[in-house]
């Protein structure tokens, strides 16, 4: 059976349009708030409201999928995000935008859980690495194109909201021409997220998603600040961030294929070791281009490989709950990691960014090496 089936291709096509809309809004909302002369703490609280919505959406989506299936859950998630987009134009104010960004956060997280769970359930233990690699490539390409759109079109609020809302609704169209089957058995009891987080044989995958959240959250949020403090111009910062993200895009497919062929444990060990090497190279401040490239290629591909590792340790009917647990773990890591790292950078040195990334990666590498002889046979084959 082909890895990239018609439902998978149509699902990823819809996701590309949704990711474009998400990237544009996430970039422009803080700027719009600043234009309304809102204080820094208000901008921060509105951003936190969005991420709080992410957490709530992650927790709710498993129940929604079980009740109405993948297709209708995807439509619902898209409509919720579209409402969060359009609502920004109804009333411009702190409390109004606090509420609408929460709604958008819920819809965004629901989209991620639905798409990731559908891909997990569509694949087998032999091709999930490639499916998740394709998913991450679409996500990063959509994010890149979204940034490109921001630089080429008018960024006025009432100019952007109509076409961003339209993009979100257009993301529904591909799924109208196919049906993603919900293959969870009806005779199984509902699986809780907590039980998945506690599952011993999947712990390396859960921990890997937390580490991935810390690494990517820190790189996304703090790398521009690090470069700025080193005297790099804004234009050059954009170039170096493009190098980082491009490396992540280029690394997805080959690493996903290697994980399917040689096993995810081996690939995870190599990835984490390369992240440590890239961090050390950045600290040495020699040859920043190759250092950033290998850091991006290894760091940005941790999440899909760790996710595939965890999902092959559970039964098929547990995949949606496991995916929720993994996305929740990633979100927690991406929230806590940058906050703690930023405090260290402010009080000590900007170099703590890469020391922190190398340290958490080293701890995870020890976990991976410790489990050398404990690799139970995958159970989610079908």
Swiss-Prot record:
Q: Per the UniProt record, which residue ranges are transmembrane?
A: 14-34, 45-65, 79-99, 102-122, 131-151, 157-177, 204-224, 235-255, 270-290, 291-311, 325-345, 348-368
Kindly state which keywords UniProt assigns to this record, in alphabetical order: Cell inner membrane, Cell membrane, Membrane, Transmembrane, Transmembrane helix, Transport
In alphabetical order, the GO MF annotations are: transmembrane transporter activity
Q: What is its main location?
A: membrane
Question: What is the protein name stated in its UniProt record?
Answer: Uncharacterized MFS-type transporter YcaD
List the GO terms this entry assigns under cellular component, sorted alphabetically: plasma membrane
The record gives the membrane topology as:
Multi-pass membrane protein
